[in-house]
UniProtKB/Swiss-Prot annotation:
GO molecular function per UniProt: ATP binding; tRNA dimethylallyltransferase activity
Protein family per UniProt: Belongs to the IPP transferase family.
Name by which UniProt lists this protein: tRNA dimethylallyltransferase
Subunit-structure text: Monomer.
InterPro entries noted in UniProt: Dimethylallyltransferase, IPT, P-loop_NTPase
Length: 313
């Protein structure tokens, strides 16, 4: 089996710098598993890695799609597998880095999403329903047939909502049940799945600090520019953390003070959900920052584990 390294963890835990040091140490290249950093023009609110921070390490799936282009887990899996093949062809090690757990799982377990690309009459019916009665009505239908999928799929992601309803209609089985069964798949890779974590108080302090820095760096201007370019708040990209809150502020729905409070609160909730996801995953290696005196010592531990697992020589 071919090697694959995963480095994940909650937002603002400090994955970026460690991932660069890791890539340099093991002759690796990085595939971003971040559902937001894939979009161009959305830099500040996504805490996107800068070319300077990359330090010459090749990155995939950063700045590859426009904000109004569809990007989802199926597309991520296809793009990531293509990137993995390219990295292997160079004799290097692919490192998946990011906090979108479902994306990581899709590649690691080679999940079959049973995409049916041919249009069906039922799909057309659902698309018409979305146009006439709106995304929320469609999402309510999903809640009735598959509440677990409804929890995972944003109401504005109409295509995924339709696919989930359609899957239930065609098979009589919730797509969430199918995806859960796929979690038990054997991975086609020789892998190590690292989860970087920190004490909750420190993590939440880092989140608050990051939000303040984003605002100082011009997050409001960034969202205003996107709005002026015609990127509507109904887009999946514009529902990302930082963007939906600032968009609401620009629409006069809340004060800047309220917006900052909501953004910090929502980001903390997001970090909590990420950790819940990673705790459910199999074979993860937890790296708690409180157990190490520096990132260098964490890196040493990671390289040691990768050597023991014969992922690197």
């Amino acid at each position: 089996m071919q090697p694959l390294v995963i480095l994940t963890g909650p937002t603002a835990v400090g994955k970026t710098k460690l991932s660069i040091d890791l890539a340099k140490s093991i002759n690796g290249e990085i595939i971003s598993a971040d559902s937001m950093q894939v979009y161009r023009h959305m830099d500040i609110g996504t805490a996107k890695i800068t070319p300077e921070e990359m330090e010459g390490v090749t990155h995939y799936l950063v700045d590859e799609f426009e904000p109004d282009e569809e990007f989802n887990v199926v597309k991520f899996k296809d793009c990531a597998k293509e990137a993995i093949r390219e990295i292997y062809s160079k004799g290097k090690v692919p490192i998946i880095v990011g906090g979108t757990g479902f994306y990581i799982q899709a590649v690691l377990k080679d999940i079959d999403f049973t995409e049916n690309d041919s249009d069906t009459p039922y799909r057309k019916e659902l698309e018409e329903l979305a146009q006439t009665e709106g995304a929320i009505k469609l999402h309510d239908i999903l809640k009735q047939c598959d509440p677990v999928a409804a929890e995972a799929i944003h109401p504005n992601n109409i295509k995924r909502t339709i696919r989930a309803i359609e899957y239930f209609k065609l098979t009589g089985e919730p797509i969430s049940k199918h995806n859960e069964e796929q979690r038990g798949n054997e991975s086609p890779y020789q892998y190590a799945y690292f989860v970087l974590n920190n004490d909750r108080e420190i993590l939440y302090e880092n989140i608050d600090l990051r939000v303040d820095k984003m605002l100082d760096a011009g997050l409001v201007k960034e969202v205003l520019w996107l709005k002026e370019q015609g990127y509507d708040r109904s887009l999946v990209s514009m529902q990302g953390l930082g963007y939906k809150e600032i968009y609401a502020y620009l629409e006069g729905e809340c004060s800047l003070e309220e917006t900052v409070y909501l953004l910090k609160r929502d980001t903390r909730h997001f970090a909590k959900r990420q950790l819940t996801w990673f705790k459910r995953e199999q074979d993860v290696i937890w790296l708690s920052k409180k157990d190490y005196n520096s990132d260098a010592s964490i890196l040493t531990e990671m390289v040691k584990i990768l050597t023991e697992k014969e992922i690197i020589k």
